């Protein structure tokens, strides 16, 4: 199977289901940003040994979100994976576990101090952009709202992970004011 089809050479692509849309379509922008986020998570997976299982689960969930967003219709006849409360709860559990190892947050933290911590912040901002892109679709079914909730919680996870990396490396957080 060839990787190239030449079907996108005129600025169009297909949704899951076959409908052709412009590559500037909001849905393409949304799942493209989720794909970008997944690549950033992959880099964290490669660089940070302490959260490999969680980061791998996050990557699989982001791939599922991409499939959901790329479906042709809001109520697709195609069997798609679901984002559930369990996916969101996994992130919340990890946030709580990491948070117990950290001092209380009293000031705004600047994204700096260690390259991996800073990369968590870069990834967090990509996550927030992905969330905004999904919200811009203004899709109401629960499956889309769960995607928004997951992305929102994932940005929190990445923030707390950035703090934990600093603590593990005995680096003081740089704060604003």
Regions found by a protein language model. Give the residues of each.
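Phosphate/pyrophosphate-binding loop motifs in nucleotide- or prenyl diphosphate-using proteins
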Residues: 1-177
């Amino acid at each position: 199977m060839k990787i190239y089809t030449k079907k996108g050479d005129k600025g169009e692509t297909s949704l899951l289901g076959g409908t052709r849309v412009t590559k500037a379509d909001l849905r393409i922008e949304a799942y493209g940003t989720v794909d970008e986020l997944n690549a950033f998570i992959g880099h964290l997976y490669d660089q940070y040994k302490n959260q490999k299982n969680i980061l791998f689960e996050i990557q699989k969930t982001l791939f599922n979100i991409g499939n959901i967003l790329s479906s042709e219709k809001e109520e697709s006849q195609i069997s798609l994976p679901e984002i559930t409360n369990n996916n969101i709860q996994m992130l919340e559990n990890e946030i709580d576990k990491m948070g117990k190892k950290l001092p209380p947050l009293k000031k705004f933290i600047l994204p700096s101090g260690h390259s991996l911590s800073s990369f968590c912040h870069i990834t967090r901002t990509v996550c927030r952009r992905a969330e905004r892109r999904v919200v811009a679709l203004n899709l109401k079914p629960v499956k889309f709202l769960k995607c928004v909730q997951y992305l929102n919680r994932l940005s929190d996870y990445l923030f707390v992970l950035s703090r934990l990396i600093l603590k593990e490396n005995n680096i003081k957080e740089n704060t604003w004011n």
